[in-house]
């Protein structure tokens, strides 16, 4: 048992010291802000929307009040909604800057979101904007968001500038699970490494991505990733081959989509967890074993172990609680939640297993009534 405790502790020492400082939450859009450019490039926001009637007015409304000095317009693609999303959007006062398209039927080989985005980017291309702002229909933006995005992109000559929208943490389930969702994402894709052109690590956050249009065309467009469930990270990887990218935390972009209970969060995570493992049962087995060692062994040894096993388990538990503190602080949560990380890790392990089971049953990648992982898993 002391060997297991020592392994868990060694893993957390590695994560704290050698994993790009992911846990420090230093990469944020309100730090090291870029100077404003002398010329403001043209931008078109592309918003895919499917059954978003409850939030579409707020999300699109936040785009229409952007304090952006350059040419800026919005293209919303109504992806066969059945709840009046398109009708509500058409009723907004867009002052001639909002165009609402009715999406075509989903062709084979495409995920729904990427197909809707592809139609929007094709329409936007008619105006030859320098940037495409890919954002979701359930995200609201502060008025200065686009101005800050463009300033950073122009200063760094970035091909993708992406913000990790702040998710809601109002319900008990959200408080327990949502900060850890971002923590785990940052662990998988350390933002410092994503932002380092010398490293191959690449990712993006789909809720807010400012993309240089010519670079996207050179990369093969959205068609190059048309069947990918984890569309944002695959877009980040595609675009990093074209130039530098940047990803950071923000309070300027916030999710309008609450998660009322554990079931909704489980569905959100399960949609893409098995895709993250390339639909491999062997990677799933290894991941489950790894999660047991990294998250569960420490508290078990700390409580029930003896001698060295207990002390290494306790040290590993303290290390993971320490690592969680900056993200808890960013989300305004008590430091005590850090000691719940083993429980949270166990729940996410269950969500990952659920994701695999859903894929095997033909319901993988479920999004807005569509099982999108079937072809990808074959």
Predicted regions span which residues?
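Short, acidic, metal-binding catalytic loop of nucleotide-sugar glycosyltransferases
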Residues: 61-71
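Active-site nucleotide-sugar/metal-binding loop of Leloir-type enzymes
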Residues: 115-131
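Membrane-embedded multi-pass helical conduit in multi-pass membrane proteins
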Residues: 283-362
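Catalytic donor/gating beta->alpha subdomain of glycosyltransferases that bind UDP-sugars
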Residues: 153, 157-186, 214-217, 222-283, ...
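A conserved acidic beta->alpha catalytic loop
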Residues: 69, 78-87, 104-106, 139
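Cell-envelope/extracellular polymer assembly enzymes that use nucleotide-activated donors
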Residues: 41-44, 73
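Short beta-strand-to-loop acidic/aromatic patch adjacent to the donor-nucleotide binding site
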Residues: 129-140
């Amino acid at each position: 048992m002391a060997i297991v405790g020592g392994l868990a502790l060694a893993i957390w020492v590695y994560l704290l010291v050698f994993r790009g400082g992911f846990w420090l939450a230093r990469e944020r859009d309100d730090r090291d802000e870029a100077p404003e450019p002398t010329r403001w490039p043209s931008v078109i926001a592309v918003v895919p929307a499917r059954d978003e009637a409850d939030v579409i007015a707020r999300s699109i409304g936040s785009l229409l009040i952007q304090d952006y000095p350059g040419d800026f317009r919005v293209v919303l693609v109504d992806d066969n909604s059945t709840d009046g999303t398109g009708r509500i959007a058409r009723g907004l006062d867009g002052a001639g800057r909002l165009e609402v398209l009715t999406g075509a039927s989903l062709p084979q080989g495409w995920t729904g979101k990427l197909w809707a985005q592809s139609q929007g980017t094709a329409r936007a291309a008619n105006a030859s904007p320098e940037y495409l702002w890919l954002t979701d229909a359930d995200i609201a933006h502060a008025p200065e968001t686009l101005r800050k995005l463009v300033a950073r992109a122009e200063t760094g000559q970035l091909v993708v500038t992406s913000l990790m929208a702040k998710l809601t943490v109002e319900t008990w389930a959200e408080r327990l699970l949502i900060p850890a969702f971002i923590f785990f994402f940052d662990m998988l894709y350390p933002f410092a490494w994503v932002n380092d052109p010398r490293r191959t690590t690449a990712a993006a956050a789909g809720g807010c991505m400012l993309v240089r249009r010519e670079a996207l065309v050179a990369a093969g467009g959205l068609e190059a990733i048309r069947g990918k469930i984890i569309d944002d990270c695959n877009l980040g990887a595609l675009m990093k081959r074209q130039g530098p990218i940047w990803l950071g935390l923000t309070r300027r972009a916030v999710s309008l989509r609450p998660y009322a209970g554990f079931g909704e969060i489980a569905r959100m995570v399960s949609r893409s967890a098995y895709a993250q493992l390339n639909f491999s049962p062997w990677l799933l087995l290894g991941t489950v074993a790894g999660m047991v060692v990294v998250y569960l062994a420490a508290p078990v040894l700390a409580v029930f172990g003896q001698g060295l096993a207990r002390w290494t388990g306790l040290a590993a538990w303290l290390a993971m609680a320490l690592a969680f503190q900056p993200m808890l602080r960013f989300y305004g949560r008590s430091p005590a939640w850090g000691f719940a990380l083993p429980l949270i890790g166990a729940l996410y392990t269950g969500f990952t297993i659920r994701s695999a089971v859903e894929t095997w049953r033909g319901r993988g990648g479920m999004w807005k009534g569509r099982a999108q992982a079937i072809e990808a898993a074959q």
